[in-house]
């Protein structure tokens, strides 16, 4: 990845991290012959990753399968953080002008607090209904 491309994508990582918020990790991986590591990251506390962290196993699978030769990106695949959180992940394959893969822009979303909130709301709704009562007869006072 050349200097200008790094600058552009590093700015994008910072921008996306700020507008998407703490439930989204945004990571830029540079792919070199001798190392593949994170060179920019926003909200890394979500997964515990930091500058210099290696590629995830899922990303290594994508590289090994050469998925980038037929697709520009992969959307909404499940991954797991080092802390065991289930994440919704998305990855953009970054290519140079010659079509050679030089990086990955990865966005990982932790929806756990929204799933927990949804479950609590459903529990609340269920506790307001009297079991066995005919529909439409439950009054909420």
Language-model region placement:
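Juxtadomain coupling helices with adjacent low-complexity linkers
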Residues: 1-19, 104, 109-141
């Amino acid at each position: 990845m050349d200097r200008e491309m790094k600058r552009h994508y590093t700015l994008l990582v910072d921008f996306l991290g700020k507008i998407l918020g703490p439930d989204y990790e945004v990571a830029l991986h540079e792919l070199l012959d001798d190392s593949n590591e994170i060179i920019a990251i926003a909200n890394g506390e979500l997964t515990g990753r930091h500058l210099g962290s290696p590629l995830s196993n899922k990303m290594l699978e994508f590289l090994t399968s050469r998925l980038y030769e037929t697709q520009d990106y992969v959307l909404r695949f499940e991954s797991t953080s080092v802390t065991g959180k289930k994440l919704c992940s998305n990855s953009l394959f970054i290519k140079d002008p010659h079509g050679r893969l030089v990086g990955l822009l990865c966005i990982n979303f932790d929806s756990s607090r929204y799933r927990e909130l949804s479950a609590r709301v459903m529990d609340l709704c269920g506790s307001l209904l009297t079991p066995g009562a005919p529909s439409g007869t439950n009054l909420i006072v």
